[in-house]
């Protein structure tokens, strides 16, 4: 019998892990859960961080105690399904401020393990976010690049909004401003750039379809040797 290629086995393992997390979530009062998504590219704060092609993303979370969450995700692209282009890990603590507002503190790590050049952009981050129901979120983050020779802590501000329209369709909006250090993403000097997105989202029964227009300021940095602008982003996702 012909053996299944290793890269395909790895992709199947990631997807099965996500599906298993979702099944456990149903059995254990949603203490576990997950999602699988297909996106047209991989965008982080307005910057394309991987080749501009279809990306498979899998994510899972665990709620070990009231208010606490642990989550992880992986992004894969063809043809190297056995080599993730991005991985993330997050621990969070949330508090209800009242019946409308919630605050969450998070520690995050973003890894880009494709090669030595992309690993330079591995990022560690701490953030505080305030959310009004599921409609509006403000966040303040500080981050640096631990693998870079010199990497001071930088600050980013983000606001996102979800405006319900009709028939499970909503307007998705976002805007942010982030500082980048000198020599990051090919920049000759440090600076601050702005980014945002506007789009439509359809959500029903665990399925999500989304199309967004990505907007960035003229001085937006680019990953060295990486892709250029990606003005449109499409997503199909299924949560479990």
Residue locations for each model-derived region?
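Short glycine/proline- and aromatic-enriched beta-strand/turn motifs that initiate or cap beta-hairpins
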Residues: 29-79
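Residue-level signature of outer-membrane beta-barrel architecture
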Residues: 40, 62-64, 93-95, 101, ...
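Repeated loop/turn-to-beta-strand initiation elements of outer-membrane beta-barrel proteins
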Residues: 32-34, 66-72, 98-105, 134-140, ...
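Cleavable N-terminal export/targeting peptides
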Residues: 1-33, 240
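Transmembrane beta-strands of outer-membrane beta-barrel pores
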Residues: 38-44, 74-80, 109-113, 132-134, ...
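Residues that define the transmembrane beta-barrel architecture of outer-membrane proteins
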Residues: 52-56, 83-87, 101, 120-124, ...
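Outer-membrane beta-barrel "beta-signal"
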Residues: 163, 198-208, 213, 226-240
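Detector for outer-membrane/organellar transmembrane beta-barrel domains
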Residues: 119-184
